[in-house]
Every structure is written in C-alpha cells, then in structure tokens.
Amino acid sequence: MYYITLNINYLWRKCDIYSMVHSHFMVLLSVLKMRRTEKMNDIFEKNHPMKDDKKFITSYWSDRARDFGSLRAKELESPKLKLWRDELMSHIFDSDRSLRILDIGCGAGFFSIILSELGHTVHGIDITPNMIEEAKQLAQSLDSDATFSVMDAENLSFDTNTFDIVVARNVTWNLPHPDKAYAEWLRVIRPGGLILNYDAEHARNHHNLPQSVHHAHEHVSNELKERCHTIYHMLDISSFTRPQWDIELLTKMGASSVSIDSTVGPRIYAEEDEFYIPVPMFLVKAIK
C-alpha cells in the first residue's frame, strides 16, 4: 500500500512538472508565433503596400522614368514609329481635321508626340511627375506641340465631352481602380468619341520571360522587376480575364460599340529588338 501511494505521489509530481513545462512551452510558442506574425506582416506591408497603391506605383515608375524616356526617344527614331503611326491612323476618324486627343498615362510622351506630328491637339497626362518631365523634354527636343500635365487617370480634371479621342498604351494593367478610369475616359470624350486602349498583362509574365529573348524589359533591374511583380499581386485587375472584362465593363457603362484586336502585338512587335513586348498586347476600342 505504501509502495502504491509513493508511486502515485511520484506520478503526480511528474504530472505537475510536465504541466508546468508544457505551460511555459505553450507561452513561449505563442510569443514566437506572435513575433513571426508581426515580422511577416511587416514584410507584407513593405512589399505589398495595399493602403497606398498609387504611391507605390508612382514610386516604381518614377525610378524607371529616365531609362524609360531614353528608350522612347530611341523608339521615335526607329521603324516602330511608322508602325505605330499607321496603327493609330487606321483607327482615327476625321483624320483630315485637327482632333482634340487625350493621351492617358502618357509616360515619356510617345503617343502624344506621334499624334501631335499628325496635326492633332494632344495633351498627355501621367500620375508620375518624373515621367511628365521626361515627356516635356522629349517633346521640346523634337519641336512637338504636345502639352503635358501631372494627373490621375482615374480622376481627370477635364470637363465632360472635352476630347474627340482618348488613347492609352500599357496603362490599364497597373491601375488600382480601372473601372473608375474607364468611366472617366468615357466622360471626357464627346458622344461618338473614341477610346483606343493598348494594353497587356505585363507584370504577370515578368518571371516567365526566357533569358535569351531580346525585349524592352531586359535591362530593367531585378529589384524593379520584383516591384513590378508586387504591383501585379496587389491589384484586383490582375485576377480579371482580359480583355473580356474590358468589353463587359465598357458595354455596361453605355459604350455604343466595343471591339478587341488581339493581333496588334504580332503586327507591331514582329521581331525581337529593344522595343519588343514579349507578352500578348491587345487593343480595346470603344465608341461613346
């Protein structure tokens, strides 16, 4: 009986020790989990700044502005100039008269300069101040009459029915609220006015580009490519099926006609050079 009691007491003490160790271990584990969660949240906030998407996007393009401007200057002196000029002219109505054209997300002013040289009144806007400076300098060097200003593509300061045409190239994929942007673009063009939106899902494919391919992004640093990929992950538009989504949205918004041209990429970028876009480009064309 004494032996049994002793063993029971021994076991109880063992249980108390186990319980105490287990309790301390669980507290320690909880603290470690909490710290790990805080660390992961810090990393996520740093790389996926959901609270201020536009600031992050603007910072990315600001850091790319100088090299981007240099590449656009070269493109304006390359065979791509004629290809893009012919492409734009094939869609522009009343080409014999001067039209009021808004270049959305104009970057270094590539479309603005081309359309201005065709005799149209063109204003380019971009949310990134450094890009607008590049556009102004490039336009001045080419004696272009195109004008530029810093403005948000989702919140235009122009009156309703101001423009005949809105053009955009490689813009919509990195807009936090593309539905608001489309609504604004439709608002500022006159009835019967035209939207020409050239776009592609650039960020989705940054990690999948063959190393041997000669393309427009091959000299972009890995750090900038990662930031570009972050933009893709933090924006809702990246999960949309495009350009079908664009068609459905513009139709719901009251566009009288919406069409898609998926052959623009192969036509403009038929060969791999420093301007080559290795992801499928498409045109969303809408009439108000």
For the regions a protein language model found, what residue spans apply to each?
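A short glycine-rich, Lys/Arg-flanked "PGG" loop and its adjoining helix->strand segment in the class I
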Residues: 179-191
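A short SAM/SAH-binding and catalytic strip from SAM-dependent methyltransferases
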Residues: 165-178
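Core SAM-dependent methyltransferase catalytic element
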Residues: 253, 270-288
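Conserved beta-strand signature within the Rossmann-like core of class I S-adenosyl-L-methionine
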Residues: 193-200
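A short acidic, Gly/Pro-enriched loop at the edge of an enzyme's catalytic core
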Residues: 154-165
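C-terminal alpha-helical "lid/dimerization" subdomain adjacent to the S-adenosyl-L-methionine
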Residues: 55, 72, 200-270
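Conserved class I S-adenosyl-L-methionine
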Residues: 35, 40-97, 110, 114, ...
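Class I SAM-dependent methyltransferase SAM/SAH-binding core
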Residues: 102-104, 108-155
